[in-house]
Amino acid sequence: MSGHQLDYTEMWVQQFADHGGGHHETHVHWDNHISGFYFLKCSDRTSVPVFHDPRAGRMMLNLPIKDHNKLCYAMERQIVRPKPGTLLMFNSYLPHEFKVDSGIDAFRFIHFNIRATPK
C-alpha cells in the first residue's frame, strides 16, 4: 500500500431516536474500501449491526447450523453485540444493516468510510 494514501470519505455521529424505531436497511458502501463503526453508547437493549454473507452461492445452500452461538460457515448473517468503546472495521462491500432500535436505552455511534487512492 506504499503507493496509496488512505482518506476518510465520510464520518458522522448517529443517535437513534429516544422513542425507538431507528434502523438502517441492508446496504453496502460501494465507493469505499473500509467502513467502520465506533460505539459510544449502547447496551443489550439497543439496536445491533447485522453483517450478511456477500457470497452469491451462499443463498443457494442451506447448511445446518449445529450451534447458533458459534460463528460457522453455514451462517448467512452474523449479529454483533457491541459494548461502549467497540470499534468494528470491515470491507465496504460487506452487506450490513442495523436492526430496529427499541428506544429503551441510548444508542449512539460513529460511522466512517475510508478509501485507498493512488498517490
What is the predicted function of each stretch?
Residues 9, 45-47, 106:
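Residue-level signal for beta-strand positions within conserved beta-sheet cores that form or flank
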Residues 70-119:
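Catalytic core of Fe(II)/2-oxoglutarate
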Residues 5, 28-32, 104-106:
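A generic structural micro-feature
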Residues 13, 49-51, 98, 110:
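Generic structural hydrophobic/aromatic packing signal, biased to beta-strands
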Residues 2-11:
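A short coil-to-beta-strand element that immediately follows conserved catalytic motifs
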Residues 15-89:
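Catalytic core of non-heme Fe(II) oxygenases with the double-stranded beta-helix
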Residues 11-13, 36-38, 110-114:
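A structural signal for short, well-ordered beta-strand segments
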